[in-house]
From Swiss-Prot:
Self-association and partners: Interacts with CCZ1. Found in a complex with RMC1, CCZ1, MON1A and MON1B. The MON1A-CCZ1B complex interacts with RIMOC1. The MON1A-CCZ1B complex interacts with RAB7A and this interaction is enhanced in the presence of RIMOC1.
Keyword Phosphoprotein: yes
Keyword Acetylation: no
Gene Ontology CC, one term: Mon1-Ccz1 complex
Protein name: Vacuolar fusion protein MON1 homolog A
A GO molecular-function descriptor: guanyl-nucleotide exchange factor activity
Length: 555
């Protein structure tokens, strides 16, 4: 697209309040087509990226043996070349799918339609049932069998153990009661490795058993959900990174070098709720599926003032200054030569949402950002701007002794917000943290997920009827998960997927520039789906400065 990329920016008026500035500003073209390529898609940052470039699902799960994750690749380095796409091309792609999708649709029908109660996931309440406790003294054999049956009813189990077979974590049940099960898992892994093979997954009788080995730990998921083995492996990697965020990779390796059968639960005692919360977030928050962060919808003028205030309220030791609201990003300012990885940001989201104690004052806690640097700790200053709001300020420092200097940054940031009139605008934005899909103006559109790959950000509307129950919301996310797994299948990735079902139609379109997943009325046609894409992309382009951070700032 040959259109200029600048947008309206904001500045302070004479009285210090927000005022738009139109000088130097040329709007992007309203239409995102033709010639849409990476860096030109709706939501693409105009002045560099905030995150390590994670162009695809595969980039998020690459081995730590790759390049240093704290450094962003140079423009044009690595990855596939940008793909130019336009509406004629997508129309042609979908026309050609009529034959190609015959087999795919059959698979989708078999795997996505509700089956028997044995196959269909449990209700959300059951899925988050507290872990089964070991039987009390004097409990009868019937009680033990009932507890075991309750444990087996869960749709997904997660286990973490050491290479010596010592239990570290289990999603349900006690580690002691499951130690023999974990021992069998380690024996299976070791047996195959003796023949120089590596076990990745087992598929049998509707179950998937997925293994991820990150020495000195082995992580295992046992699931009868519609998630692919690849996505289950991604969840296990998140759990591994969660453990590293508490210990650091260097400390973890040192512990097991000294004592191979060390019981890691001693060090992780009390952190189970953080891992539990991470699993719950991954079950309902599409941020993890998309490998991206979602921004709080906010007027560009307000966001610019918030970012500038963060930039100016800094200390020498600060690396990242982040303002969050309900697991949505409001603003992020980084040191000029450092980039955050989406996985590290998700782990910070999880840390904050897993504890209400951060609302009680200013916290100063060590935290490892494993994709940035797994060898050491940063220190994070965490505080809510006000106890009755969801605005949480996160200041990441390299100096453990710098609490008071970083705390003063918080004070100066709040002063600047009030002086510029942005504080009240933020509180008002929190009243409507999500937008309605009706604003898009596509009658049959029910919901969508859109990710800009170059910015590492995504947007989606509020989930509304007919998905207003928790069970239906989890079902919708399950449909997106399935489309995502087909689009990113390691052996046969699909660029476009079109599915028609009894309850909704689904569409996926994955390019080098963006990913789009749409859900709309089952009465729609393939032609209307293509038309809906065009309207939706035009709307996202029009609203991009409210839905994305287009001009990220640095110190």
């Amino acid at each position: 697209m040959a259109a200029d990329m600048q947008r309206k920016r904001s500045s302070e008026g004479p009285d210090g309040t927000l005022a738009p500035s139109d000088g130097q500003s040329v709007e992007r073209a309203e239409s995102p087509t033709p010639g849409l390529a990476q860096g030109m898609e709706p939501g693409a940052g105009q002045e560099g990226a905030m995150f390590v470039h994670a162009r695809s699902y595969e980039d998020l799960t690459e081995s730590e043996d790759g390049a240093a994750s704290g450094e962003s690749p140079k423009e044009g380095a690595g990855g596939p070349p940008p793909l130019a796409t336009d509406m004629r091309q997508i129309s042609q792609d979908f026309s050609e799918l009529s034959t190609q999708l015959t087999g795919v649709a059959r698979d989708l029908q078999e795997e996505m339609l509700p089956g028997s109660s044995e196959d269909w996931p449990e209700s959300p309440g059951a899925a988050r049932r507290p872990a089964t406790e070991p039987p009390r003294d004097g409990a009868g054999e019937g009680d033990e069998e009932e507890a075991a049956e309750a444990w087996r009813r869960h749709q997904k189990h997660v286990f973490v153990l050491s290479e010596a077979g010592k239990p570290v974590y289990s999603r349900y049940g006690s580690e002691e009661a499951l130690s023999s099960t974990m021992g069998v898992m380690v024996a299976l892994v070791s047996f195959l490795e003796a023949d120089k093979n590596a076990i990745r997954s087992i598929h049998a009788d509707g179950y998937k058993v997925v293994f991820v080995r990150r020495s000195p730990l082995v992580l295992v998921a046992v699931a009868r959900t519609r998630q692919s083995a690849q996505e289950l492996a991604q969840e296990l990697l998140y759990i591994y990174y969660q453990i590293l965020s508490l210990l650091t990779g260097a400390q973890l390796s040192h512990i097991f070098q000294q004592k191979q059968n060390y019981d890691l639960r001693r060090l992780l005692s009390g952190s189970e709720r953080i891992t539990d919360n991470l699993l719950q977030l991954m079950a309902r928050d599409p941020s993890f599926l998309m490998g991206a962060a979602r921004c709080l919808p906010l007027a560009a003028a307000v966001r610019d003032v918030v970012s500038a205030s963060l930039q100016q309220a800094r200390a020498r030791s600060l690396v990242f200054s982040i303002l969050l609201a309900r697991n949505q990003l409001v603003a992020l300012v980084r040191r000029k030569d450092q980039f955050l990885h989406p996985i590290d940001l998700h782990l910070l989201f999880n840390l904050i949402s897993s504890s209400s104690s951060f609302r009680e004052g200013e916290a100063w806690t060590p935290v490892c950002l494993p994709k940035f640097n797994a060898a050491g700790f940063f220190h994070a200053h965490i505080s809510y701007l006000e106890p009755d709001t969801d605005l949480c300020l996160l200041l990441v420092s390299t100096d453990r002794e710098d609490f008071f200097a970083v705390s003063d940054c918080r004070r100066r940031f709040q002063e600047r917000l009030r002086k510029r009139g942005a504080h009240l605008a933020l509180r008002e934005a929190l009243r409507t943290p999500y937008y309605s899909v009706a604003q898009v103006g596509v009658p049959d559109l029910r919901h969508f997920l859109y990710k800009s790959k170059s910015s590492g950000l995504f947007t989606s509307p509020e989930i509304e009827a007919p998905y207003d129950s928790e069970e239906e919301q989890e079902r919708l996310l399950g449909l997106y998960q399935y489309l995502h797994s087909r689009a990113h299948n390691a052996s046969r990735p699909l660029k476009t997927i079109y599915y028609t079902g009894p309850n909704e139609n689904l569409l996926a379109w994955v390019t080098g520039a963006f990913e789009l997943y749409m859900c709309y009325s089952p009465l729609g046609t393939k032609a209307s789906a293509v038309s809906a894409i065009h309207k939706l992309m035009r709307w996202i382009r029009k609203e991009e400065d409210r839905l994305f951070i287009l001009t990220p700032l640095t110190y």
